Amino acid sequence: MDDMVSTEKDVFEPSLPDISSDTFKESNEKIAELSKKGYQLLKESEFDKAREAFFQILDIEDNNNYALVGLGDTSRKENKFNEAITFYNKCLSFYPSNNYALFGLADCYKALNQFSKAIDIWQQYLVHDDKNITVITRVADAYRKIHEFKKSKELYLKVLEMEKDNPYALIGLGHLSYDFKEYKDALGYWTRIYDLNLDNVDIRVLTAIGNCHRKLKTFEKGTFFFEKALERDPKNFYALFGLADCYRGMNQQAKSIEYWNMILELDPKNKVILTRAGDAYRTIGNYDEAVKYYTKALEIDFDIYAAIGLALICKCQGKFEEAVDRFKNLIRNDPRNSRLYVDLAECYSLMNKKDEAIKLLEDYLRNDGKNIQIRNLLERLRK
């Protein structure tokens, strides 16, 4: 979500001087002409033609910086990052302070998830231009990616001192806060982006704000932002998921099911969503539908929540022996899952096998003596 706002103008494209035919020799005129042509073709995504123009420059002048940067930019825009790195490094071997080569090289390392290398290159860039907000935000983003959160936050705040309401800094601070579960702070940063852009805000800002409300359990407020996102993109997974989960949180299971099923129309083999839909059907007592969804999920791959759902249905339907067998099997595969012991103990209790329930919970507490839920249930059973 790092590019939530509209793509910024590429301010790092080399600006060519006006070259007069009276001032420069014919070869320089040709280089200037080919450079302008190459960058224009690059803007038009005519990559092969742009590359041809830049190579023609190298035929005239070996190691021309415009040509080498242009070839790097062409490869970078084609996502051929290692090839681009070769061109940028060659340029820097002759022109160590070339900002365009430094910026392109850093962006390549960023795209390859080599964030430490990207930071090193951007730091070299900042030696020549330490007020460049675009580069500073990129360094902050990279620090966030390598979990250098303190440095990242310092740089984002530095950007906001230089330019109030800089969208990239606000977005980055939102991510930092969200990652540290500081959802109110994240909501504040992302809401500021929304307030500044309103109807033109990127859809990812809308879903990010919605997700903050989900985490804060202010579900009704969350639905507003997820619905606005769906107005932009009716098939947006994050908006559909957010609405389904908000309605689940508001205990409006029928509405929740509506959105789970909309996701499944787009992605019918999503076992997580199949299980969520199964849970919703189980909650409203539609066990037949719930079984269908859980079974579909398990046919794709084992899902413990789907398996638990089937066991809970047996428990709710009074099929206690089957429920006990299911919970025992699950415990064998996941012996530290306290929820399974609670459900199994409740089954024993409903079967008038209170002693077995008590023994089960006592055995569990030998390994996890501080589990409050288990201790409370054990206390109730002993009364």
What are these regions (language model features)?
Residues 31, 65-66, 99-100, 133-134, ...:
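Helix-start (N-cap) detector for alpha-helical repeat units in TPR-like alpha-solenoids
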